Every structure is written in structure tokens, then in C-alpha cells.
Swiss-Prot record:
Described function: Encapsidates the negative strand viral RNA, protecting it from nucleases. The encapsidated genomic RNA is termed the ribonucleoprotein (RNP) and serves as template for transcription and replication. The RNP needs to be localized in the host nucleus to start an infectious cycle, but is too large to diffuse through the nuclear pore complex. NP comprises at least 2 nuclear localization signals that are responsible for the active RNP import into the nucleus through cellular importin alpha/beta pathway.
Source organism of the structure: Influenza A virus (strain A/Memphis/110/1976 H3N2)
Membrane-crossing segments per the record: none
Record's GO cellular component terms: helical viral capsid; host cell; host cell nucleus; ribonucleoprotein complex; viral nucleocapsid
Gene: NP
SUPFAM superfamilies (alphabetical): flu NP-like (SSF161003)
Motif extent (Bipartite nuclear localization signal): 198-216
Major localization listed first in the record, in broad terms: virion
Name of the protein described by the UniProt record: Nucleoprotein
Highest taxon in the source lineage: Viruses
The keyword Phosphoprotein is annotated on this UniProt entry: no
Length: 498
């Protein structure tokens, strides 16, 4: 792995922490959750929301968005320098849903960004509490990953839509810091780098001058983040090549796409954390729970326990299935969009279906949708078992996979074999081993060829009963191998649009 000296747990990244012991980490993550919860309670008071309205996930998303927008300094600066008609750069807002005379009504609210920043800081003991902001960004990113398949974005950068399991975090904003970088998939990093290289090809001055120096260091930093996700020497050596290139161009794009493809079998390390909507933290804090005192972890039992005891509601469109909406949000809560569905079904205790079989659209409601026919229902976010989240890709092996998604990116550290469609993946690697990286390419292909179906990942790791807080009795799950393993199977999920 990365040199042990520089590695920090993602709880440390999450809290910008220096080296801390487990108790300190749990306390600082708890403090972050407390801050989000207190902010949410205050916003519900400002907006005069009832308890039910405050537990509506659509209201939660609007409130989270408002605070993220209030702290988006780069965009705020841009809006002030490029005033556009009908947009007040100093204000932020969105739709808030209220129950009036037995009907759901949409109300557009507008607040001064300065006021929102004041409320946020007050809830966070006067700090900017960047970690809490990033936490909400990751929750939005996980929800996007579960709701949309990034087919168009993949095709535009010359990648294959079947590589969607590599795209975790593809909608995270650039300002999401170290915690954001930790949860980005290999494909996401590759896509960001390819976009950068393409700009350099089209714009002569992109790498030049004072700005070019900044661009270059950003490029090298992104290469290093991607390199740190790879687990084999050959993949890392390839990233060194890409990073050191004097004038990045098509050869580097080729190498990047090659390395992304290879990650379908030789998976990278991608962190997973359960980031819940603010409307879960708010009521918990309101009930008197002290997250900082009790301690909290994003990768252990805590989010599962919290969801066992939370009531969250969602607006439901006329032909949507509330159970399907619940599955969508449950997967997002556990950062499990690219996990094997058979394992998810086991942990959740109810069948988890591929995206294309779900009768549900995204959680957000567009401004032109008719509110008269909107109902609301409870989201079922409880689970049968819990499992430890992983930041490793697991070791590699093969099994029948699907026409849509041809690999998985594990979210839980649980013993199983990881499905991928070897013949489909290997077909992309015919004879393309020329050029500077030929020896690395040959080595990577050799390792991929050698990946065996029998190999088990996360050996000895199991799921745990919810009563087993100390994780003492692992239950190693058994799977029905006849079921489909991929979520975006031959898929028709909507496309993500900014």
C-alpha cells in the first residue's frame, strides 16, 4: 500500500485530523455529525417545518444544498463577477415541501448566503466545519451514484459504459478535499485526468505561464491520488509514466483508459463510508443523543444503528414503488451503488434489485412536476445485519457477470468472490502493447489473465448481527449464485445531468 508514514485513516481525512487514536477519531467524527444535526434543527425552526416535514428527505436535500452553495467560494466569486439575469449571487434557496390541508405544497425559499453561513458556524461552535460540508457532499455523491448511470460521461471521455463500477464519486465537486479524493473510483480519477489532457490538447496555453504551473501541479496531484488507489506495481508504474509526461496528450489518454480497464479485474482501493442525510442526524441530536461524547464511525456499526432507529419520509410520484425508493436511498446511505447485489440482499434482509427493475426515479422532484398527485411514504432504511465498510478493492477473481455492468467495487469487507466478466473485459486488451508502457501493459495483462474465479476476497470476514456491536461473531453469508450480481445490469437508469 502507500507508504505507511503518510497514510491516514479516512476518519482522519474526514476531520482534517493529525494522527489520532481510535477514541479521538470517533469523537471528532461525532463532533462533525453533531454540527450537521444542530444546523439541521436550526434550519427546520427557521423554515417552520413540522416534525414530519423535517424528516422529509427532499427538504433535507434542499437544506444541505443551501449550505453547500453558501460555502462554495469559487462559485460565489464567479457569480459576482459574471452576474446573470435573475440570479442573486448573494442568495441561495430551493424547494421546501409542506403539508397543507392534506396536500403536499412546494414553496420556494430564498436566504442570504451570509445568514446560512452564520447558522452553520453557530451550529459548529464558530468553525467553518469543512469536514461536515464534505460529509454532505459525499452523501449527495453516493445518492447520485445509486440513482444515475454515467453512460454519457464515460463515452465522452472514450471509456465504455460497462465500466460504471469504477465511477464512484464522479459527481463530487472539486473542493471535496482529501475525504472526497478517498471515495473517488478509479474511473472518476481517469475521467478527470482525461478532461484535463483534452483541454491541454485544444488550448495551447493550458500548461503555460503562471496558471499553467498551477494546472501542472494539480495534474500531478491527481495522478498521485490515482496511483495511490492501484494495488499492483505495474499499474502504479504506469501512473508514474503518465504523471511525468512532459506534454500530456493522446498517448497518456490511451494509458489512462488502459489502466481504468485493468481496474475492472485488478481493482483499486476506494474508500466507502456511510454518509446519511441531515434529516437523520437532526432528530437524533434533538432527542438528546451526544455524538461527540458517544463517538461515531462512518465505517462501522454506527450508521446501521442510527438508521434502525430513524424515521425518514419521502415524496412518492404516482407510479413509483415506495419499496424501490427505499432501496435506492438505503444503497446510497451505505455507499453501495457498485457492490454485489447478492451481498446487499443478505445484509439488508430483503432482495435488492438491479436499477433497471426499480419503479422509481430520483429522489429530487423537479420544479415543473405536479404536486397535486404527490403522496409521501416512510423509507425503510433498516438492515438485518451490519458489516464493516472497506477501502480495499478486494483481491480479484471471476464469475458470470452481466451485460450492463461487468465488475463490482466492493463496499463491505465480507468474504465472497467478486463477480466480473473476464472474457468481455479481456476482449478489450487485444495486442495493444506498443509504446513506452509496453512492458507494464504486458505485465498488467498477464496478471489479469491469471485472475482466478475460485479466489475468495476478504477471507474470514463476515457480516454481524446488529446486537453484536463489537463484531465478535462473524456470519459468513451464503449466496444464491443464480441471481444477478450487478446493479446497473443491462440498464436503463436515467442519465445524470448537472
Amino acid at each position: 500500500m502507500a507508504s505507511q508514514g503518510t497514510k491516514r485513516s479516512y476518519e482522519q481525512m474526514e476531520t482534517d485530523g493529525e494522527r489520532q487514536n481510535a477514541t479521538e477519531i470517533r469523537a471528532s467524527v461525532g463532533k462533525m455529525i453533531d454540527g450537521i444535526g444542530r444546523f439541521y434543527i436550526q434550519m427546520c425552526t427557521e423554515l417552520k417545518l413540522s416534525d414530519y416535514e423535517g424528516r422529509l428527505i427532499q427538504n433535507s436535500l434542499t437544506i444541505e444544498r443551501m449550505v453547500l452553495s453558501a460555502f462554495d467560494e469559487r462559485r460565489n466569486r464567479y457569480l459576482e463577477e459574471h452576474p446573470s439575469a435573475g440570479k442573486d449571487p448573494k442568495k441561495t434557496g430551493g424547494p421546501i415541501y409542506k403539508r397543507v390541508d392534506g396536500k403536499w405544497m412546494r414553496e420556494l425559499v430564498l436566504y442570504d448566503k451570509e445568514e446560512i453561513r452564520r447558522i452553520w458556524r453557530q451550529a459548529n461552535n464558530g468553525d467553518d466545519a469543512t469536514a461536515g460540508l464534505t460529509h454532505m457532499m459525499i452523501w449527495h455523491s453516493n445518492l447520485n451514484d445509486t440513482t444515475y448511470q454515467r453512460t454519457r460521461a464515460l463515452v465522452r471521455t472514450g471509456m465504455d459504459p460497462r465500466m460504471c463500477s469504477l465511477m464512484q464519486g464522479s459527481t463530487l465537486p472539486r473542493r471535496s478535499g482529501a475525504a472526497g479524493a478517498a471515495v473517488k473510483g478509479v474511473g472518476t480519477m481517469v475521467m478527470e485526468l482525461i478532461r484535463m489532457i483534452k483541454r491541454g490538447i485544444n488550448d495551447r496555453n493550458f500548461w503555460r505561464g503562471e496558471n499553467g504551473r498551477k494546472t501542472r501541479s494539480a495534474y500531478e496531484r491527481m495522478c498521485n491520488i490515482l496511483k495511490g488507489k492501484f494495488q499492483t506495481a505495474a499499474q502504479r508504474a504506469m501512473m508514474d509514466q503518465v504523471r511525468e509526461s512532459r506534454n500530456p496528450g493522446n498517448a497518456e489518454i490511451e494509458d489512462l483508459i488502459f489502466s481504468a480497464r485493468s481496474a475492472l479485474i485488478l481493482r483499486g482501493s476506494v474508500a466507502h463510508k456511510s454518509c446519511l442525510p441531515a434529516c437523520v442526524y437532526g432528530p437524533a441530536v434533538a432527542s438528546g443523543y451526544d455524538f461527540e461524547k458517544e463517538g461515531y464511525s462512518l465505517v462501522g456499526i454506527d450508521p446501521f444503528k442510527l438508521l434502525q432507529n430513524s424515521q425518514v419520509y419521502s415524496l412518492i410520484r404516482p407510479n413509483e414503488n415506495p419499496a424501490h425508493k427505499s432501496q435506492l436511498v438505503w444503497m446510497a446511505c451505505h455507499s453501495a451503488a457498485f457492490e454485489d447485489l447478492r451481498l446487499l440482499s443478505f445484509i439488508r434482509g430483503t432482495k435488492v434489485s438491479p436499477r433497471g427493475k426499480l419503479s422509481t426515479r430520483g429522489v429530487q422532484i423537479a420544479s415543473n412536476e405536479n404536486m397535486d398527485t404527490m403522496e409521501s411514504s416512510t423509507l425503510e432504511l433498516r438492515s438485518r445485519y451490519w458489516a464493516i465498510r472497506t477501502r480495499s478493492g478486494g483481491n480479484t477473481n471471476q464469475q458470470r457477470a452481466s451485460a450492463g455492468q461487468i465488475s463490482v467495487q466492493p463496499a463491505f469487507s465480507v468474504q465472497r468472490n467478486l463477480p466480473f466478466d473476464k472474457s468481455t473485459i479481456m476482449a478489450a486488451f487485444t495486442g495493444n502493447t506498443e509504446g513506452r508502457t509496453s512492458d507494464m501493459r504486458a505485465e498488467i495483462i498477464r496478471m489479469m489473465e491469471g485472475a482466478k474465479p475460485e479466489e475468495v476476497s476478504f477471507r474470514g470476514r463476515g457480516v454481524f448481527e446488529l446486537s453484536d456491536e463489537k463484531a465478535t461473531n462473524p456470519v459468513v453469508p451464503s449466496f444464491d449464485m443464480s441471481n444477478e450480481g450487478s446493479y446497473f445490469f443491462g440498464d436503463n437508469a436515467e442519465e445524470y445531468d448537472n
